[in-house]
Amino acid sequence: MTARTLYDKIWDAHLAHEAEDGTCLLYIDRHLVHEVTSPQAFEGLRMAGRTVRAPDKTIAVPDHNVPTTLGRENPDQMTEDSRIQVEALDKNAKDFGIHYYPVSDIRQGIVHIVGPEQGWTLPGMTVVCGDSHTATHGAFGALAHGIGTSEVEHVLATQTLIQKKSKNMKVEITGKLRPGVTAKDITLSVIGATGTAGGTGYVIEYCGEAIRDLSMEGRMTVCNMAIEGGARAGLIAPDEKTYEYVQGRPHAPKGAQWEAALAWWKTLYSDDDAHWDKVVTIKGEDIAPVVTWGTSPEDVLPISAMVPAPEDFTGGKVDAARRSLDYMGLTPGTPLSEIEIDTVFIGSCTNGRIEDLRAAAEILKGKKIAVKRAMVVPGSGLVRAQAEEEGLADIFKQAGFEWRMAGCSMCLAMNPDQLSEGERCASTSNRNFEGRQGYKGRTHLVSPAMAAAAAVTGKLTDVRDLM
């Protein structure tokens, strides 16, 4: 048999039909749903008199619009648009009989944290959601990517998706990471090296010693931002860490089913002589703690660097850099470590897990914030409960952080947690576009530890100076 990549193997296992022009019909194992991209899809089912084809494989949770303050069940805390969307999801979940974690459920949280946490995400699966950061689930060796609302309706109705196959791209991170360097630094560094279009047309498989050394939560951070690198999806082959994470979770296989699943999962790796259409190799020891300076995730530099000048770029990037610097209010030649910060946000589907909170709390222990406001938003109610049990919440609160309820929060300006005009934020989220966190808000993407360092110094700071 021809040597295949991990992507090839998962694709082949789910291929229901292939047309002469390469258009394929794929079977979908898990469909994750949230309140923003699903209302029109469910309404389309109603109008056509259709049911959800596989309600047992469809999981819904409100996350984008929900407030993160106490008493958030009160509809007055939401804008009318947000309230309508959350109430629509409540009704649609009930009417169509799908799995649902409402705001009142401790298991509620960001859909890409809830899925793995509850054992819905398993190796070798196809996973889709009407959300671009669905690639997160690729950390389990699952083929996971975002879809549009019309596709959400198609999957709800048929449990299949029409697709054309992407090309194979390998991103290898060799060697060991240095102290203070994290999964977030890996994924930002890859995007900085390849650009936001570097993965366009590809599915990325991340591999190498530095990737293998990561925990499952670190791997989720890496895969989460595959989309910012332009890729359709990001994958990491499953291994013992994967199996250990999955085993015993509420919806993971058990008994004989576990053994059968495990046998298949152990075949999910890229063959040694598989063909790659593109290969990128980065030495792990060359990666430093990084920060974004502009308005694209590819605007990445080590914290030790200086704000670049437009003249440092070529072609169309000269004008783009000039616009970014103007929007961000930065002067070329300024050391990144001298940029003052107003706000710190720790959370999101990129960095809202328990290990992220532990890393931030380790830096904050015994210190006070030097910024105007700082908030920690756990990725799920269960993460929040665990952080409280471990004493992390007390560390955050004593440092001066707001300790919030679970949700997407300040990652995107679709709920009450937003930046004001000109407000500068060190954020553990995934996008630094103009207006992403609020009208004319300024975003610097960093790891949780780097965000904590900025909180206590009041400026972008090399976390290694505080370790």
From Swiss-Prot:
Pathway annotation from the record: Amino-acid biosynthesis; L-leucine biosynthesis; L-leucine from 3-methyl-2-oxobutanoate: step 2/4
Gene Ontology molecular functions: 3-isopropylmalate dehydratase activity; 4 iron, 4 sulfur cluster binding; metal ion binding
Cofactor: [4Fe-4S] cluster
Cofactor comment: Binds 1 [4Fe-4S] cluster per subunit.
Gene3D superfamilies given in the database record: Aconitase, domain 3 (3.30.499.10)
Catalysed transformations (reactions): (2R,3S)-3-isopropylmalate = (2S)-2-isopropylmalate
Broad class of enzyme this protein falls into: lyase
Signal peptide positions (record): none
Pfam families noted in UniProt: Aconitase
GO terms for biological process, alphabetical: L-leucine biosynthetic process
Subunit (UniProt): Heterodimer of LeuC and LeuD.
Its job: Catalyzes the isomerization between 2-isopropylmalate and 3-isopropylmalate, via the formation of 2-isopropylmaleate.
Family: Belongs to the aconitase/IPM isomerase family. LeuC type 1 subfamily.
Protein name per the record: 3-isopropylmalate dehydratase large subunit
Species for this entry: Dinoroseobacter shibae (strain DSM 16493 / NCIMB 14021 / DFL 12)
Gene designation per UniProt: leuC
